[in-house]
Structure formats: structure tokens, C-alpha cells
Amino acid sequence: KDKKLLILSNGTVVLDQDKFNTLLKLDVVKFSLDSAISKTFYRIDRALKNINLEKMIEKMAEFKTQFKGDLVMEILVVKDLNDNEEEFIALNQALAKIAPLRVDLSTIDRPPAYAVKKISEERLLELSKLITSTPVLLPKRHYEGEKLNFNEEELLKMLHLRSQSEIDIENKLDKTSQLLLDKLIKE
């Protein structure tokens, strides 16, 4: 069993006991939770109007207690919707209950379905500091300084924590690490 099975879900699947039980069999589960405040949650995730947010958070926490794999949370930050201190204090409290391995925090980076705007990387970093209950991973699109030189173990750990785009690999890793990664992929 050298490959891991991952699913990305909006999190509502925990409300269905059959789906809840099925997810327990996976290696990595990634739930999105863009707000822990009902009014904002329904504005961002418009299709989920009939979902009880508090119950969903409780079921995510219950899922974590039974899950043997890695539970990761994903938060998409949208300008003027969930990009404020109140939102992140509420998210931090919800994340403390859920207790995931980590949180992947990002903003809009593709053309959105609705008229929404991204926030700056600087603001994303500021908001990430309000999440103290679990480790936070931030995407970094613009790299400065020296490129990283990773050995095989470090490369595998990095990829285990977060998949990397080709752009990320080109910008983050030195040539030696890129060649080693190519070799690992071919094996």
C-alpha cells in the first residue's frame, strides 16, 4: 500500500452516516470550511443553505476522533467576506474542536464562478496568525532567496504535507532536488 487515497470535500458528507463511515476507510480526508459563522458560511457556500453549520462542525470533530488517517482542513479566504478577525477567531475555535493535522489557507487564484476578490499574500499571512489551534500552511507563489536543497526523505515529507505545482517545484527547489524528485516520480 504505497499510494494514499485522498478526498477533498466541502465537509457536508459527515452529515450522512454512510458517507461518514466510507470516509473513515481513506488515508487522507480534506474538508473545506470557509467560515464558522453561519451568515458568512451561507454567503460563501451558496449551495449549502440547508446545512446546519454547527452540526457539521460537531460531526467533523467526531469524524476526527474515529479517523485513523490524516485530516486536513482547507479555508478559502475571500475579500470582504471572511477576511476579518471575527471570522478567524470563530474559525480558530472550530478548528480547535475538529483538531486536524493542519489547515491549508488560501485565497482566490483562479477565475471564480461569482464576483469575488482575492486578498493579498500579506493579509493572508496576517490572518493565518489568528489560527493558533493547529498548524497552518500558506501557498507561496512568489519566492525570494535561496532555493531549497532537499534529500529524498525531506522531499517525500513535503509532498506528504502538501502537493506541489510544477511552478512551486521550479521556484522552491534547487536543480539537485528537482532531479531527485524526477527520479522518485519515475520509480
Feature locations, PLM:
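Canonical radical SAM enzyme core domain
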Residues: 1-28, 33-37, 51, 55, ...
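Short, basic/glycine-rich phosphate-binding loops at helix/coil junctions
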Residues: 36-40, 70-72
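Short, conserved loop/helix-junction motifs that constitute active-site signature segments
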Residues: 21-25, 64-67, 96-99
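Auxiliary Fe-S-binding modules of radical SAM enzymes
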Residues: 86-187
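Conserved strand-turn element in the central/C-terminal portion of the radical SAM core barrel
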Residues: 60-84, 105-113, 144-145
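Structural preference for beta-strand elements that scaffold enzyme active sites
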Residues: 4-6, 28-30, 70-74, 102, ...
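Short glycine-enriched, charge-decorated loop/helix-capping segments at active-site entrances
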Residues: 43-50, 117-118
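Glycine-rich S-adenosyl-L-methionine
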Residues: 47-64
